[in-house]
């Protein structure tokens, strides 16, 4: 029976099989012999073979390793399509942009990212259902549970805390903002437009509402609220409003457009209005950043945030 178990154990190896043995186990004082099954498997000569002895060399005799500087990374061709996430990643750290978007090194999403995805998916499916029939809070919370992504969190306590916070966010949203008679015109609306003749921008509107000729682009946020000054300077909202003025997307005028950040944690809404001239300037600013990306060698930008890099 022992021989059979030994054989079964050996046949479970997928790439390599290591057989180890010791002359003494635990507090035993009498030296033990190697199992005869090992001799049967490998042969006596292989088991009794002694490894060649190598005299230890002084570490001082070794030449220090000279690290060769890493060659700058240069894409094969100019990058011609961007999203808001790509642009902000480059602004944060060019090296992270290179790893994530050019070399496409996969990273596992964090718990906070999965939390945001779960909330967005629950709201999206809730409104889709509301377009077909009457819905209640129980529908929204059931969809939240069904869409919950339960990985990436630092601990089970972290996951439970965020799940509870999300439940409170959605309950507040339903009680204070949901109206069955006033549903969005578009949900999770994908868009792409040409910022210049050669540069395409892609993205997704969380929600688009229309009242006569007035359009409101709503972006749900699960994180910390920003103030009006930060919202007015938001590159993300500038990009959304630029997209909304494109004839192939909404074709709205600057005067008829409002961009709103909806902070689900507090129920706070902060809206942004831009003039036609301000959107033209925003377009220039985005073009300059993209020009920097295409001229970059994607060197790292070290800082305290490196400890949190995926």
What are these language model-derived features?
Residues 1-46, 59, 89, 290-310:
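C-terminal accessory regions
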Residues 2-6, 111, 115, 119, ...:
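Hydrophobic (often cysteine-bearing) scaffold residues that line and stabilize catalytic clefts
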Residues 39-129, 166, 181, 185:
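C-terminal, charged and often intrinsically disordered regions of DNA end-processing helicases
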Residues 70, 79, 276-308:
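Polybasic (Lys/Arg-rich)
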Residues 122-195:
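A non-catalytic, helix-rich entry segment at domain boundaries
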Residues 192-283:
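Mg2+/Mn2+-dependent nuclease catalytic core
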């Amino acid at each position: 029976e022992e021989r059979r178990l030994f054989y079964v154990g050996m046949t479970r190896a997928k790439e390599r099989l290591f057989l180890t043995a010791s002359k003494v186990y635990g507090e035993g004082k009498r030296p033990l012999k190697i199992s005869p099954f090992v001799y049967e498997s490998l042969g006596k000569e292989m088991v009794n073979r002694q490894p060649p002895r190598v005299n230890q060399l002084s570490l001082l005799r070794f030449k220090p390793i000279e690290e060769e500087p890493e060659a700058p990374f240069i894409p094969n061709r100019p990058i011609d399509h961007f999203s808001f996430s790509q642009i902000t990643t480059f602004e944060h750290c060019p090296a992270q942009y290179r790893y994530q978007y050019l070399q496409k090194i996969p990273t596992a999403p964090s718990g906070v990212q999965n939390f945001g995805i779960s909330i967005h998916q629950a709201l999206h499916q809730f409104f889709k259902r509301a377009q077909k029939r009457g819905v209640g809070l129980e529908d929204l919370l059931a969809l939240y549970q069904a869409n919950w992504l339960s990985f990436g969190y630092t601990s089970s306590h972290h996951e439970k805390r965020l799940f509870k916070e999300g439940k409170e966010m959605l309950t507040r949203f339903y009680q204070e903002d949901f109206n069955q008679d006033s549903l969005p015109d578009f949900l999770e609306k994908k868009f792409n437009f040409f910022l210049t003749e050669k540069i395409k921008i892609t993205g997704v509107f969380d929600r688009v509402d229309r009242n006569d000729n007035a359009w409101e682009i709503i972006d749900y946020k699960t994180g910390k609220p920003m103030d009006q000054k930060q919202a007015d300077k938001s590159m993300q909202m500038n990009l959304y409003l630029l997209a909304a003025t494109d004839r192939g997307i909404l074709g709205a005028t600057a005067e008829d457009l409002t961009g709103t950040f909806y902070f689900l944690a507090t129920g706070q809404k902060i809206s942004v209005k831009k003039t036609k001239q301000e959107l033209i300037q925003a377009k220039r600013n985005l073009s300059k950043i993209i020009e920097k990306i295409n001229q970059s060698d994607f060197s790292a930008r070290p800082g305290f945030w490196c400890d949190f890099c995926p």
